[in-house]
Regions:
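Exposed beta-strand-loop-beta-strand "reactive/processing" segments of non-cytosolic proteins
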Residues: 58-109, 155-203, 385
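Short, non-transmembrane alpha-helical segments in secretory-pathway proteins
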Residues: 36-77, 126-167
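Extended effector regions of multi-domain proteins
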Residues: 32, 113, 117-127, 183-407, ...
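Bacterial N-terminal signal peptides
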Residues: 17-27
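Bacterial N-terminal signal peptides that target proteins for export
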Residues: 9-19
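Hydrophobic or amphipathic alpha-helical targeting/insertion segments
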Residues: 102-132, 136, 140
């Protein structure tokens, strides 16, 4: 494989640079050559026109999640064929009258449809028209009107929130609706639920097929949530750092090279990550992105027991992007990139400042004191690539953090507003009986049900090439006295994961379990160069084994699953998780039990958190985090921040 991807780079010294550590590179020609760069608004508009003009396109198409079509990895790895990679986008196309689903792929340079796939009966992610139709069906229902009258609530003061139904039946399009009071501006702030009312709606027939209602509860009073906008710009900050270099969509900072892109479904995607070692570009990851997400709620009342969300596959992370603001969300020195998406009606919409790239101080990178007068240390510098998706009440801050010590951290921040329910009474129960066993009281009138967040990351790692080996590493104290004569032994157990079914792995914090992805390239001591995958925020399923949601989201069973690379295997819960019957995604990916040793492997890592609400989480949650680290392990010959031949010896002052 040709290591020099974009032509002749200048020789560089990336160690012991000034803190901003910018890299100056040769420019590429006028023609854009990076196949991973963000699709432009004009490219998306061209794709819409080409699809509409195609004879196979429905008369009244709906466009869902149009994004960059995955460039062929086979072509990309062959340097002689890279220039032949077509510039393509792909979109799910819905034919509403026939309830048929297609996937169209368009070459936006040659303006032709290159592929059309007819998809077996599935339910696609929710769209704008689904929300509008559900709202109109609810408001026209006598049950809806009667429920509000009995509660003394005006119809005009109610917001209707639509959820994916969670019903495992793809033959009919179903959604569920919940009710909230709106504020004076007509906004749903989530602090005043109309508790105990929900509906299951058949969108095709326009009917409510299930009405759920529990005894009337008093609507909670308005909270300080309404005053948050007054402080929206508080805490503005700046940074003395400088932005990274971008060439044809590629970020170049210190020894790092990669291309960020915002997909309509997955949100932030990081392509073609390499580390520049002298004049050699060493591959680390071909593609890194969130694959799927699940949020199940733990309250057992009739309007809560069904609540769960596959936020990526049912709603889309990219399409729910929030614009980032300098000096508030990100430093003033950040580079901001916009992204464009296509609406259900085929209208191109741009989200300004959807991706932020900024450098920041990462604390002490290393330090050593030889004696009181001889102290050496260095600061860590980090480059952060960040995107924020806002899905109804929650805001998710997705960050990829590249450190100058060679570490990559994936950090998902959770903030926004908790989903709350109106309490049956205002008394605190210290025994936590009744509904306070399942939800934490945060005000006298509000309870926050316990829930979990699972984030599955699809990591297509290529450590120094595509032929990799994944090794599970445990650290334990040997029980055999012959191996632990003095009782202080700490032994590493290492075994290579040989096949896909064997590659369905769970974390074990008692063993400090990690997974090492090794190349076939020996390092300076003869061991294979590698990166270690460390899920720092593990979460374990609390759903009963018999719960149907576990079948629909098998990825939550494993903190790490390993599969052989397959370009068609992108989503841990399957391509269409909305109303899926289950066992899609990972169960099918591992069914062939392909061999994994010295193969092109993909890791599916699940991290997350169990959220037990606190009063401090109200009215808006401080950011909590779920993290995964990729740690170089024998990838470098030593600490990459230190170059001995360039370092002067530490001088100590003689003490008298």
């Amino acid at each position: 494989m040709d290591d020099d991807i974009y032509g002749n780079l200048l020789a560089m010294k990336y160690i012991l640079m000034p803190i901003w550590a910018l890299l100056v590179v040769t420019t590429i020609g006028a023609a854009q050559s990076n196949p991973f760069r963000q699709p432009t608004a004009s490219e998306l508009a061209a794709a819409v026109r080409v699809i509409r003009a195609d004879a196979r396109c429905p008369a009244r198409p709906r466009f869902v999640a149009m994004s960059l079509a995955e460039p062929s990895k086979t072509l990309w790895l062959d340097s002689a064929k890279r220039k032949s990679i077509p510039r393509e986008v792909r979109s799910t196309i819905i034919d509403p009258p026939a309830a048929k689903v297609y996937e169209f792929t368009v070459d936006v340079v040659n303006k032709i449809v290159t592929e059309v796939r007819a998809v077996p009966p599935v339910q696609w992610m929710l769209t704008e028209s689904d929300y509008a139709r559900a709202d109109s069906i609810m408001r026209a229902s006598p049950r809806f009107v009667d429920a509000l009258l009995r509660r003394g609530v005006s119809i005009d003061s109610v917001a209707i929130e639509t959820w994916a139904s969670g019903v495992p039946d793809a033959s009919v399009r179903l959604v569920r609706c919940l009710l909230y009071h709106v504020d004076a501006r007509g906004l749903n702030r989530y602090d005043r639920p109309i508790e105990g009312v929900s509906a299951l709606i058949d969108l095709a027939s326009g009917t409510i097929i299930q009405w759920m209602e529990s005894p009337i509860r008093q609507t909670p009073p308005a909270s300080s949530l309404h005053d948050l906008t007054a402080a929206i710009n508080d805490g503005a900050f700046s940074s003395a750092t400088r932005p990274p270099t971008l060439v044809d969509g590629e970020v170049q900072w210190n020894a790092w090279r990669f291309t960020p892109m915002l997909a309509a479904r997955e949100g932030l995607v990081i392509y073609n990550t390499r580390w520049v070692d002298g004049v050699t570009q060493r591959p680390i990851a071909h593609r890194m992105a969130l694959s799927e997400m699940l949020v199940p709620y733990g309250d057992t009342s009739v309007t809560w027991t069904w609540r769960n969300a596959f936020d990526i596959g049912e709603y889309g992370f990219g399409m729910t992007s929030s614009s980032l603001r300098k000096g508030v969300d990100v430093p003033t020195s950040a580079v901001l990139l916009s992204a464009s998406f296509v609406s259900e009606q085929g209208v191109v919409r741009s989200v300004p400042n959807a991706i932020a790239i900024f450098e920041r101080d990462g604390g002490v990178a290393w330090r050593h004191t030889t004696n009181a007068q001889a102290i050496a240390s260095q600061r860590r510098r980090e480059l952060v690539v960040q995107h924020i998706a806002t899905l109804a009440n929650y805001d998710y801050l997705v960050s990829y953090i590249f450190s100058n010590d060679g570490t990559i951290t994936v950090d998902i921040g959770l903030t926004g507003v908790m989903l709350v329910k109106a309490a049956a009474d205002t008394a605190f129960d210290a025994r936590e009986f009744g509904e306070q066993m399942l939800a934490h009281r945060i005000t006298r009138s509000l309870l926050a049900p316990t829930h979990q967040h699972y984030f599955n990351l699809r990591l297509d790692l290529d450590i120094d090439g595509v032929d990799n080996v994944v090794t599970e590493v445990d650290v334990r104290s040997p029980l055999d006295q012959s191996e632990n004569r003095f009782g202080n032994a700490m032994m590493m157990d290492q075994w290579d994961i040989r096949s896909e079914r064997e590659g369905l792995r769970t974390a074990d914090p008692r063993m400090s379990r990690t997974w090492r992805v090794s190349s076939t390239r020996p390092n300076h001591v003869g061991a294979a160069t590698a990166f270690t995958v460390i899920p720092e925020s593990t979460v374990y399923p609390l759903l009963a084994l018999s719960h149907p949601l576990r079948r629909r989201a098998r990825f939550i069973e494993y903190q790490c699953a390993i599969t052989k690379y397959n370009a068609d295997e992108m989503y841990a819960a399957g391509a269409y998780p909305n109303q899926s019957a289950g066992d899609e995604g990972l169960p099918k990916f591992v069914a062939n039990d392909d061999r994994l040793v010295r193969r092109d492997v993909v890791l599916w890592c699940t991290i997350g958190t169990t959220h037990v609400g606190r009063s401090e989480d109200w009215p808006v949650m401080p950011v909590s985090n779920a993290r995964l680290r990729l740690l170089p392990t024998g990838f470098h010959s030593q600490n990459p921040l230190i170059v001995p031949q360039q370092s002067a010896p530490i001088k100590s002052k003689k003490t008298k």
